Amino acid sequence: MGIAGLAIGFMEVLKRLFEQHFHSPVERVQPLQGQLGGSGRKIIRLSTEKLSAIGILYDVREENVAFLEFSRHFRRHGLPVPEIYAEDLSHGAYLEEDLGSTTLFELLSDQRSGASVAPEAVAAYRKVVAVLPRFQVEAGRDLNYKVCYPRAGFDRQSIAWDLNYFKYYFLRLAGIPFNEQALEDDFSRLTKFLLSASRDYFLYRDFQSRNIMLRKILNEDQPFFLDYQGGRKGALQYDIASLLYDAKADLPHDLRQQLLDHYLDSLAAFVALDRSLFMQYYYAYVYVRIMQALGAYGFRGFYERKEHFLQSVPYALKNLRWLLHNVELPIALPTLMEAFKSMVASEKLQGLTSEPEQLTVRVFSFSFHRGLPQDETGNGGGFVFDGRSLPNPGREERFKTLTGKDAPVIDYLNQQESVRQFLADAKSLVDASVSTYRHRGFKHLMVSFGCTGGQHRSVYLAEELAKHLRAKDGVEVVVRHREQEQLNQ
């Protein structure tokens, strides 16, 4: 059932939870689509002028229970996860803290220049890997593993599910040849080796850049964490491997090594760490995490025909290529390694790098006093948003010489619920057009934000939309601040 098809009764459940918690009626409801990739959960932002929360609708009770219990447990340990405001498990609904809309992946994509990673993104990653041991060790010590779903531990059964997922939904559907029995023998050897590592810690399971939110606190990006409902007891190596070999993040190897070292330094404060023993198992867990991800890409992309999932495959193959050339595991897995070599050499899989025609989205800020920006492409498609109804920083003396790109103005506008809702609505409308334009092969879309002077609100809105769009595949974003450019000429 899609967002649009949500039964009125279920939406009313979320509204009731909001009103009971905040003692205020809901004024706006904003479905958030695509936030959780392949998940079946429905995510809705409910808000008033000053209040906001995220409502979740999901019909797998065991997974809901795991998320709710883990969230409360982690908060008791002082970890940065959303507060749970209210729940109604009989309807598969709960209400949680709104952590905003900026993920670690969006920051990485927005600040990126070619292969290099911006200092702001590196700093955020360092904070993330420093917090991870607190989840794994500190909070993992007294966690109630009985509520884990679908397994209490990353055990033989869990590993078998992941390996078979990879075999049947990726290798088979991608047409990679292999000897079934020989591959099963390698799977058995790999499983035995993985299970010989210490597995007495919390394994987050989906510890990757799209599940980490960033919020500005004292003008610095601070990480908050989501999507740990699949967590269970397991080895330390799995989660750091998930983060550093997150396919679309495409982190350079030298940065991966720096972050791994920083993680191990942080981990040493919580456990008696034998680094050589940790590294003995590390790359085996990297391989198994990559296989799990490829199985997911194959299931969503090859089987369900959701082709955008396949755009991550070339990045995963790049990781495999590096591993094949630089890492030798302590165990022999000849058939599996041959399958990997066939994958990285496959013309079919290499062809997945040919993405649809790129769409260029031109985002303008402007002053209504000077008229609308002109569409120089001749396409004529897009939006003009009027931001004059929003709170105006230009009326305050402290902001008069600043623009919507300056931190004090950004912080001021970020705190305005009306601005957040306006921006969420604009993103939703533009996202729908971007999807349609790409599907139909259009090359240009224009989005303009206007305000009184073209200095504060319109500049801020244009920058925020551009940051959001840069995280999308096959979209080039060009930002123009018309009035500011004319002032600087």
Language model features: what each stretch is:
Residues 14, 19-22, 140-152, 157, ...:
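An alpha-helical support segment within catalytic cores of ATP-dependent transferases
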Residues 40-46, 190-238, 250:
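Active-site acidic catalytic loop and adjacent metal/ATP-binding pocket
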Residues 44-161, 172:
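ATP-binding pocket architecture of kinase catalytic cores
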Residues 28-44:
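ATP-binding glycine-rich phosphate-binding loop
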Residues 164-173, 236-272, 287-303, 316-323:
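Active-site activation/catalytic loop segments of kinase-like enzymes and analogous catalytic loops
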Residues 352-445, 485-488:
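C-terminal accessory "lid"/substrate-recognition subdomains
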Residues 443-466:
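Catalytic cysteine-centered active loop of the rhodanese-like fold, especially the PTP/DSP P-loop
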Residues 295-353:
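ATP/Mg2+ or Mg2+-diphosphate-binding catalytic cores
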